[in-house]
Amino acid sequence: MTTSGALFPSLVPGSRGSSTKYLVEFRAGKMSLKGTTVTPDKRKGLVYIQQTDDSLIHFCWKDRTSGTVEDDLIIFPDDCEFKRVPQCPSGRVYVLKFKAGSKRLFFWMQEPKTDQDEEHCRKVNECLNNPPMPGSLGASGSSGHELSALGGEGGLQSLLGNMSHSQLMQLIGPAGLGGLGGLGALTGPGLASLLGSSGPPASSSSSSSRSQSAAVTPSSSTSSARATPAPSAPAAASATSPSPAPSSGNGTSTAASPTQPIQLSDLQSILATMNVPAGPGGSQQVDLASVLTPEIMAPILANADVQERLLPYLPSGESLPQTADEIQNTLTSPQFQQALGMFSAALASGQLGPLMCQFGLPAEAVEAANKGDVEAFAKAMQNNAKSDPKEGDTKDKKDEEEDMSLD
């Protein structure tokens, strides 16, 4: 996972390595599911949860003997639940169950004592569904006056206007704009560019999507044939779980150098804490979530051309087939509807104009975004779509011209 690059490379270079401090970690092995039976993988393993510098939460499992990380799942709030399997005789089997689809991952505890099993389970659910705010773990950052200067009148728009397309995509992607990362993963980079939100941080913990966690890297390994100790007797020495020291342990986490470059994550933090004001002139705001209801979307999604255009933006994964039904499930999910509402609020704030300009939207759409007029923005996008010739029509017309030239 790459870290966010500096927005101002002309300043003294600085870097932020990925945080190596685990939010939760405990020794546990994997289990393979065949039919209705789970079989333990006897390898010594470690389950841990880590928050990287892009604010994403990773649920990981690694082989403690080889050090190989076999599972690295990006999880968003309300994606899944970690709970004990009551049908297991030993009582030490737990399952990570995704709320969307049938994806389930089973683990068996390898800690010598059982008294912390339920506490580990509670911490896992807490970290997955209520992740800590970025920077709350002591990661170094830019000084307060630098961040407040960015949020000044005109400063933020000027900064956004000078950002490259790739930086904007990173900003509005998995970790950008109020933590609406689930939506970015849900719809892919093409649609995520228009579906960020600068809503208050209180809503960011619930604005998730089940998608990218399902676009996780599925484990490709099965039960190993190597001779290992019995599951009930983990070795004391080799089973000691590694706990790397946090990268910010040099004592300078709270006093950043004035010349330290402002990082992309700093701007994300600013946008995440921005208050969305009421619409200009007290005009009534349009909530896209109340407009794009499942009933209205159903006939649109039934169109084969629409399906063909949306399919590439669906996540690919073992339990997420790229089908028309999956499009329907995605766009009618509560998470997507909530994200639409948050995007409506952000658009109505009048602060997304510079971003819309960067994405090459028509002048009418940019002007509407600057005014916070959601209805005018939608009409501008609709008019632009009507004025652009369809790819198929252009191709047919070109073929006709070639045929005429041959005659």
From Swiss-Prot:
Present in all tissues examined (at protein level). The modification Phosphoserine is found at S15, S140, S211, S405. InterPro entries: DEUBAD_dom, Rpn13/ADRM1, Rpn13/ADRM1_Pru, Rpn13/ADRM1_Pru_sf, RPN13_DEUBAD, RPN13_DEUBAD_sf. GO terms for biological process: adipose tissue development; follicle-stimulating hormone signaling pathway; oogenesis; ovarian follicle development; positive regulation of growth hormone receptor signaling pathway; regulation of T cell differentiation in thymus; seminiferous tubule development; Sertoli cell development. CDD domains: PH_Rpn13. Component of the 26S proteasome, a multiprotein complex involved in the ATP-dependent degradation of ubiquitinated proteins. This complex plays a key role in the maintenance of protein homeostasis by removing misfolded or damaged proteins, which could impair cellular functions, and by removing proteins whose functions are no longer required. Therefore, the proteasome participates in numerous cellular processes, including cell cycle progression, apoptosis, or DNA damage repair. Within the complex, functions as a proteasomal ubiquitin receptor. The Pru (pleckstrin-like receptor for ubiquitin) domain mediates interactions with PSMD1 and ubiquitin. Preferential binding to the proximal subunit of 'Lys-48'-linked diubiquitin allows UCHL5 access to the distal subunit. PANTHER family: ADHESION REGULATING MOLECULE 1 110 KDA CELL MEMBRANE GLYCOPROTEIN, PROTEASOMAL UBIQUITIN RECEPTOR ADRM1. This is Proteasomal ubiquitin receptor ADRM1. The lineage of its organism: Eukaryota, Metazoa, Chordata, Craniata, Vertebrata. The gene is Adrm1.
